[in-house]
């Protein structure tokens, strides 16, 4: 039987696929390639290009493949300030609804959902735990919270079992440098610092007040991928639905990120510029992942800032144009 990974051509999803295949799992990937890259899909995975909102397409995948469980990474990006917020909400919610309906039709009752720490909003009491009440502020957090609630309602209605993983800032890349972060217009601090080091950006935009004075918990994408695989094992054992935070419990400032990047890259001066976003954000955000470590057996292996930036730099320097270079070679 196979694990279906929706969004398996995206950043975190592709790393989860590699981890599954390294563990000898059979994997099926579904991705619309709206933000993902076919070049990121492991060659041993069965790949279907299409949108999970397309019921006919999704049913064909379930007809063709013997699906045991699903990992859900697919998401339509939701800009913080955009007139597309409502349509992006609709795309994400409809995708989840269609996926759950087809899973139910084909008697697939296990799903791991890649959620986000953004569901917590701006909590006053730190560190946050899974018992902290979600109060999302940004559209990204709001839609993730609504999708989480859809899973909870599906469990009540017909017994679906789920694991929701609330991840903090994903970063780094596969140690092989075969896959990494390429989102076109990057919004993640570490990627933008490294793109500045490569000369692709004149300087690093540091958002005020969020990144300028705040501290953030950055989690290596390989550790996130491992947690999603452990969540599949949890469900295979017939255990109850769970929600887990995925964090290291150690936060870094933008200045620390830039200094570490200068050390790793050997480039002595990476210029930064403060940018006023006008968006209310938590200055410092810390969380506990003790529950995931205890119940899933999650043991992060890449949790040093230098290791994170080293792997990210290896990817960016080997692939300065992202997956675009692969398309040129294949063309």
Q: What kind of feature is each model-predicted range?
A:
Residues 1-173:
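N-terminal Rossmann-like NAD(P)+-binding domain of SDR-like oxidoreductases, especially those catalyzing
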Residues 152-230, 259-262:
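NAD(P)-dependent short-chain dehydrogenase/reductase
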Residues 21, 62, 100, 104, ...:
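A structural alpha-helix within SAM-dependent methyltransferase catalytic domains
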Residues 198-331:
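C-terminal substrate-binding subdomain of Rossmann-fold SDR/epimerase-dehydratase oxidoreductases
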Residues 83-85, 139, 178-182, 203, ...:
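Short, solvent-exposed loop/turn segments at secondary-structure boundaries
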Residues 6, 90-93, 141, 183, ...:
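Short, solvent-exposed loop/helix junctions and linker helices
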Residues 72-75, 172, 194-198, 313-317:
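Short amphipathic alpha-helical interface segments enriched in basic and hydrophobic/aromatic residues
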């Amino acid at each position: 039987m196979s694990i279906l990974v929706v969004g398996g051509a995206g950043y975190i999803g592709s790393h989860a696929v590699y981890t599954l295949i390294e563990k000898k799992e059979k994997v099926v990937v579904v991705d619309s390639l709206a933000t993902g890259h076919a070049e990121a899909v492991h060659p041993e995975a069965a790949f279907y290009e299409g949108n999970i909102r397309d019921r006919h397409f999704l049913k064909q995948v379930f007809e063709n493949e013997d699906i045991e469980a699903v990992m859900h990474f697919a998401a339509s990006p939701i800009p913080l300030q955009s007139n597309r917020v409502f349509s992006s909400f609709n795309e994400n919610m409809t995708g989840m609804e269609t996926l759950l309906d087809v899973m139910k039709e084909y008697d697939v009752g296990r799903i791991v959902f890649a959620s986000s720490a953004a569901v917590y909003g701006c909590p006053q009491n730190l560190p946050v735990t899974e018992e902290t009440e979600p109060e999302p502020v940004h559209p990204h957090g709001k839609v993730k919270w609504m999708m989480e609630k859809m899973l909870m309602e599906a469990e009540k209605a017909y017994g679906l079992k789920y694991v929701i993983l609330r991840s903090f800032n994903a970063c780094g890349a596969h140690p092989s440098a075969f896959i990494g972060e390429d989102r076109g217009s990057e919004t993640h601090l570490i990627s933008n610092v490294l793109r500045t080091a490569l000369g692709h950006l004149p300087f690093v935009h540091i958002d005020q007040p969020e990144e300028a004075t705040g501290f953030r918990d950055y989690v290596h994408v390989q550790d996130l991928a491992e947690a999603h695989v452990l969540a599949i094992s949890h469900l295979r054992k017939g255990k109850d639905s769970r929600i887990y935070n995925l964090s290291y419990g150690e936060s870094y400032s933008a200045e620390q990120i830039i200094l570490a990047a200068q050390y790793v890259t050997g480039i002595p001066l990476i210029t930064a510029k403060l940018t006023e976003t006008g968006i209310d954000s938590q200055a410092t955000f810390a969380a506990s992942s003790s529950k995931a470590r205890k119940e899933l057996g999650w043991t992060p292996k890449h949790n040093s800032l230098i290791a994170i930036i080293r792997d990210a730099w290896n990817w960016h320097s080997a692939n300065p144009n992202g997956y675009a270079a692969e398309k040129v070679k294949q063309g």
